[in-house]
Amino acid sequence: MRGTPGDADGGGRAVYQSMCKPITGTINDLNQQVWTLQGQNLVAVPRSDSVTPVTVAVITCKYPEALEQGRGDPIYLGIQNPEMCLYCEKVGEQPTLQLKEQKIMDLYGQPEPVKPFLFYRAKTGRTSTLESVAFPDWFIASSKRDQPIILTSELGKSYNTAFELNIND
């Protein structure tokens, strides 16, 4: 997102620009656990020289005005190699976090927001929370080592919901 909050032409709102490619990097939680891929699951493992974190791809939704305001920047979140995107769906009564073979730029190019694949990224200092757009008040979370990345509605309890996104320059 590129914004000029005080710009008169933008009406005091952020001005969004089209992007030609996502930004990439890695994600870790405050316990220095990084995201890795084990089979079809994202798992949090302690950072070490022998661990290769997944490369995440992030791109801002082109149509933030179509979504709830004040919750954070709406982003699509994917991984590279294999190219997959995170999305949320209800399994039984519980919203769950899934990976789906999906090109992030195909989502970005859709004529309207694809809510199951969108997350509100709310930044606080160097960390961010990632809240499901499809399931408000459900956040991406990690827990103990070698456990899958999940969705939780229990902020600040037994799960880590604050993540650092380390962007490649």
Swiss-Prot record:
Coiled-coil annotated residue ranges, if any: none
Organ and tissue specificity: Highly expressed in tissues containing epithelial cells: skin, lung, stomach and esophagus. Expressed in bronchial epithelial. In skin is expressed only in keratinocytes but not in fibroblasts, endothelial cells or melanocytes. Up-regulated in lesional psoriasis skin. Expressed in monocyte-derived dendritic cells and M1 macrophages.
GO biological process assignments: cell-cell signaling; cellular response to lipopolysaccharide; cytokine-mediated signaling pathway; immune response; inflammatory response; innate immune response
GO cellular component: cytosol; extracellular region; extracellular space; nucleoplasm; plasma membrane
UniProt keyword terms in alphabetical order: Cytokine, Cytoplasm, Immunity, Inflammatory response, Innate immunity, Secreted
Subunit organization: Interacts with cargo receptor TMED10; the interaction mediates the translocation from the cytoplasm into the ERGIC (endoplasmic reticulum-Golgi intermediate compartment) and thereby secretion.
The protein's name in its UniProt record: Interleukin-36 gamma
Organism for this UniProt entry: Homo sapiens
